Amino acid sequence: MARDGITLRCEECKMENYITKKNKKLHTEKLETKKFCPKCNSHVTHKEKK
């Protein structure tokens, strides 16, 4: 299958908060989005974990 599970990590505290799926054949770049981090208690940038 082309869809793989990925983990999103907070850029400030490095906590892994979200799990999602993406098609790695169509989207080769790393996913980056602003989401809520409960440890930072604010909306911060989350990037795809290596």
UniProtKB/Swiss-Prot annotation:
GO cellular component, one term: ribonucleoprotein complex
Alphabetized UniProt keyword annotations: Ribonucleoprotein, Ribosomal protein
Entry-linked Gene3D superfamilies: Ribosomal protein L33
Domain of life assignment: Bacteria
Any one of the GO BP annotations: translation
Record GO terms (molecular function): structural constituent of ribosome
HAMAP family, alphabetized: Ribosomal_bL33
Family, similarity comment: Belongs to the bacterial ribosomal protein bL33 family.
PANTHER family (alphabetical): 50S RIBOSOMAL PROTEIN L33, CHLOROPLASTIC, LARGE RIBOSOMAL SUBUNIT PROTEIN BL33C
Protein's name in the database: Large ribosomal subunit protein bL33
Organism of provenance: Mycoplasma mobile (strain ATCC 43663 / 163K / NCTC 11711)
